[in-house]
Amino acid sequence: MCAVCLVASCEPRVGYARLAANLCYDDCETALDGGESPASPYLEQLRQALELARAHQERRIEKGAVIIERPDITINLEGAGENITVSLDEDPLAPKAHLLVSELMVLTNAALAAWAKEHGVTLLHRTQDVAIPKEFSGIWQTPLEIARVVKALAPAVLETNPRPHAGLGEAMYAPSTSPLRRYPDMINETQIISLLRDGKPRWSKEELDTLLPLLNAHLDAAGQVQRFRPRYWKLLYFKQQGDRWWPAVITDENDAFVTVNMPKEQMIVRARRQFFGERTHPGQELEIRLGKVHPLQNDFQLLETREI
């Protein structure tokens, strides 16, 4: 790593890592803030890693990265069967710890992608080879900001060609750091380990290209389940809360429809313009009432709005 936070070289090795401690985000955040926690003995390493993470993020933003930050929501279930009660909590903030992990993950995956290209190893790359307006680079946190930049971004695709990922601000990106959670990461790690151990990758480019359609179909199906699962519990939460007013923000509009974001619950509802006042505009805060809520049908409707 050079002074301007560019990876000078990457040399992966196969070996065993000895875990010194099992630390959570909250403990690391407490230590970085100067408090006592199980992570305190490793404070110097955490500080060095955080400094690297901050420098790496700044470099990515300079190269056009679009970074979206929103709080994580924990869905709590109490009871069983028809007696389940749903509640939502916002996870404790740990921005330094999350930044440390996410940036080192991006750095590693980008470095491995470049190493693989240099050594002729085909990996599965996450690409977004599009031009993003310069004004969209940066860190976005409010519902209106997030809606604006997401609308302008083309979705990333999985392919075997090492092309740029504009949203990440990386020349190439091959996800490899989470082989236990993501199938593309497992394939990429297998390719890397096979080359290091056997002198050749496990699969050829042609074999991975043949695998991609089936893999993408399975990933899309799994993604639908992962998106629907928390959405189902949130819809059940709305239904259990009964008739009440919910804080919301308008994020988009056209002649026929208005899109509303519920920031705390991280849900979006779209309704006809007739439900809104004449002065409706993106960024406007208001309160909404929900009408019919169908958790199993993955649907809910806006019933009424009022300005605040």
Per-range role (PLM):
Residues M1-I308:
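Electropositive polyanion-binding surfaces
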